[in-house]
């Protein structure tokens, strides 16, 4: 597996004879020799950065690379901060669960949904319970009847391996 390299080609590392050159926030110099573009960058006290090395001719920009890199890092940090992380809470049930236990687990599920978290209900089938998986579906449907006013069923009760699963999302 190859990693993408973020190596930036700039200043003396640019090995092409001519580039299409732009000055950061100003005019375009057009197609000039790499040496001429480097001289112009040195006059301005900035860096010559190769932006599009695959273009014909390659595109270079005269800019303050340190400032540019700092702004890019801040943008990435801001995007990461604004990402929404979905919290999925799992509630385990059994086929032989008592009514009081269901009420207790439903109370917790309601709290999770009120906080905006997703809830995954799982009924584990043991031993002979595997012979009648519909009983697990009945338990999930009983739970659904208790929480349908605060949640939206994302996935219907579904049999997966030894579990019957149901996903519930908070109402909007």
Curated annotation (Swiss-Prot):
Q: What's an example GO cellular component term for this entry?
A: membrane
- Key words of the record: Cytoplasm, Initiation factor, Protein biosynthesis
Q: From which domain of life does this come? A: Bacteria
One molecular function GO term is: ribosome binding
- Tell me where in or outside the cell this protein is found: Cytoplasm
Tell me the Pfam families matching this sequence.
Answer: IF3_C (PF00707), IF3_N (PF05198)
Biological process annotations from GO: ribosome disassembly
Keyword Protein biosynthesis recorded: yes
Entry keyword Heme: no
What the protein does?
A: IF-3 binds to the 30S ribosomal subunit and shifts the equilibrium between 70S ribosomes and their 50S and 30S subunits in favor of the free subunits, thus enhancing the availability of 30S subunits on which protein synthesis initiation begins.
HAMAP family found in the cross-reference section: IF_3
What's this protein's family per the entry? Belongs to the IF-3 family.
Q: Which PANTHER family match?
A: TRANSLATION INITIATION FACTOR IF-3, TRANSLATION INITIATION FACTOR IF-3, MITOCHONDRIAL
Quaternary state and interactors: Monomer.
Q: What name does the UniProt record give this protein? A: Translation initiation factor IF-3
Q: Which organism is it from?
A: Sulfurimonas denitrificans (strain ATCC 33889 / DSM 1251) (Thiomicrospira denitrificans (strain ATCC 33889 / DSM 1251))
């Amino acid at each position: 597996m190859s990693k993408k390299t973020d190596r930036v080609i700039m200043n003396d590392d640019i090995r092409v004879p001519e580039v299409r050159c732009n000055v950061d926030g100003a005019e375009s110099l057009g197609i000039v020799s790499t040496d001429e573009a480097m001289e112009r960058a040195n006059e301005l006290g900035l860096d010559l950065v190769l932006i599009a090395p695959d273009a014909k001719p390659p595109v270079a920009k005269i800019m303050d690379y340190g400032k540019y890199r700092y702004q890019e890092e801040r943008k990435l940090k801001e995007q990461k901060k604004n990402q929404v992380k979905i919290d999925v809470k799992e509630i385990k049930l059994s086929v032989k669960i008592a009514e009081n236990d269901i009420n207790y687990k439903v109370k917790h599920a309601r709290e999770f949904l009120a906080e905006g978290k997703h809830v995954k209900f799982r009924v584990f089938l043991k031993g002979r319970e595997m012979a009648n998986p519909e009983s697990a579906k009945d338990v999930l449907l009983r739970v659904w009847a208790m929480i349908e006013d605060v949640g939206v069923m994302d996935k219907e009760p579904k049999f997966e391996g030894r579990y019957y699963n149901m996903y519930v999302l908070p109402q909007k």
